[in-house]
Amino acid sequence: MRKINIFDTTLRDGEQSAGINLNLQEKLEIARQLERLGVDIIEAGFPASSKGDFQAVKQIAETIKTCSVTGLARSVQSDIDAAWEALKGGAEPRLHLFIATSPIHMKYKLQMTPEQVIETAVESVKYAKRYFPIVQWSAEDACRSELPFLAKIITEVIKAGATVINIPDTVGYITPKEYGNIFTFLSNNVPNIEKVSLSAHCHDDLGMAVANSLAAIEHGATQIEGTINGIGERAGNAALEEIAVALYIRKDYYQAETRLNLQEIKRTSNLVSKLTGVVIPPNKAVIGKNAFAHESGIHQDGVLKEKTTYEIISPELVGVQSNSMVLGKHSGRHALRNRVEELGYTLSDEEVNKLFVRFKELADKKKDITDDDLVALIFEEKFDHFKDFYQLSSLQVQYGTNQIPTAVVVLKDGQGNEIQEAATGAGSVEALYNTLERCFKTSVTLLDYRIESVSGGRDALAQVFVKVRVNDIETSGRGTAQDVLEASAKAYINAVNRVFMIETMRAENQKVAMQ
């Protein structure tokens, strides 16, 4: 059975989704979970694009031990140099080089002739091979490229030392039959193509990213690129969890397999969703909450008699737990730590101590603490602190029928100074956000607001997700609390803190550029 390598680009292509801005700690946590999932390659970022991306790629490369870490680079020496400095400490450094090959890109974006594009591609691969044992070369917009030219340039980059050839459907234009035919054409028209790995990278603009990826496997691809939950620019990328499960369920047809630990899929999906703020649609294949629900009476009757009548994927296959351990106010620190580790999270002693305090506070108000509650507390303690920016000290909201809602908020800034403001609004949340905007002394546009319960019951934790725009920066934020307004405030502060973090990084990058 053929082995298919899984190339995860959640941290690079996935993060290009509008409003997703992950900090270093969040990227590291996702990378660790991808390692537990068993992906073969993690594309950690674009090292030359910014100081922040460089540091993230470097730390991920030095942290991850059981899979290869790569970074993206344009076909210029400075990008390749930056990528090597970021990746050289990894277990298996590899580079992902790209240049556009379609007529429209060569003419309008690159403003280069086809001959110049070939020369640039060859020289960049030769230069990269001085550093990297594995060089992946991508033909950007390959699916709108002329096939004879595509075969010609691939022939030359293989001669120059490329070890993986990637065929991206950059704009989500191709159909499965056409995409498969490209791989067949290249296999028949590129000398020595059997000496390299062929890779597929599909976007979902026409809703065919997963189907196209599977078609590529049928026609010789041995590496598939995609993201968790299919997140990515525009309509997103191929959803890796769907491809992996399709290969597992239909191994009789595809005769191919991955090395993914499928039981880690749900946990990985939830982690990415919570950290990015991108909600998982309930009808999402493999990991949506309705994926294993049966509404029809006929279906329910069949499933009760024999699950396989209507259920081709068992919830347990992808790590959906039928039950979870419940902790309470009498649970100790040791039980808490054990459960945190069983859930797949690594916390320092200091983080466990802080989490235990939050856990006890919640246990005094809520009888049973479920796994979902615990994960929400972990996220708040581990990822939601921006020590150099704003933190919520207290809030008070006055609301009554036929009264104007009024909010009073006290924040602490990065220097420990208290800021107190008050404002009114048409509703409690608007009053709260108007007050916070005064505290920030900057104009904030709320683009999206979403609330959900973490678990069931009247005493359930509330989790709020927001998306905001400040100047030209869009970010998302999240907040968790038993009180809806407190969760709303935390989410808003979290999102705006991310804006300030990005502005700080931009300023640092400008200083470096001027030196």
Swiss-Prot record:
Its EC number is 2.3.3.13. Keywords: Amino-acid biosynthesis, Branched-chain amino acid biosynthesis, Cytoplasm, Leucine biosynthesis, Manganese, Metal-binding, Transferase. Residues 4-266 form the Pyruvate carboxyltransferase domain. Disulfide bonds: none annotated. Its cofactor is Mn(2+). Its main location: cytoplasm. It holds the Pfam family HCS_D2. Mn(2+) binds at D13, H201, H203, N237. InterPro entries: 2-IPM_HCS-like (IPR050073), 2-isopropylmalate_synth_dimer (IPR013709), AIPM/Hcit_synth_CS (IPR002034), Aldolase_TIM (IPR013785), LeuA/HCS_post-cat (IPR054691), LeuA_allosteric_dom_sf (IPR036230), LeuA_bact_synth (IPR005671), PYR_CT (IPR000891). Pathway: Amino-acid biosynthesis; L-leucine biosynthesis; L-leucine from 3-methyl-2-oxobutanoate: step 1/4. GO terms for cellular component: cytoplasm. GO terms for molecular function: 2-isopropylmalate synthase activity; acetyl-CoA C-acetyltransferase activity; manganese ion binding. The keyword Coiled coil does not apply. It is found in: Cytoplasm. Residues 391-515 are annotated as: Regulatory domain. The keyword Membrane does not apply. It catalyses: 3-methyl-2-oxobutanoate + acetyl-CoA + H2O = (2S)-2-isopropylmalate + CoA + H(+). Catalyzes the condensation of the acetyl group of acetyl-CoA with 3-methyl-2-oxobutanoate (2-ketoisovalerate) to form 3-carboxy-3-hydroxy-4-methylpentanoate (2-isopropylmalate). Belongs to the alpha-IPM synthase/homocitrate synthase family. LeuA type 1 subfamily. Homodimer. This is 2-isopropylmalate synthase. It comes from Geobacillus sp. (strain WCH70).
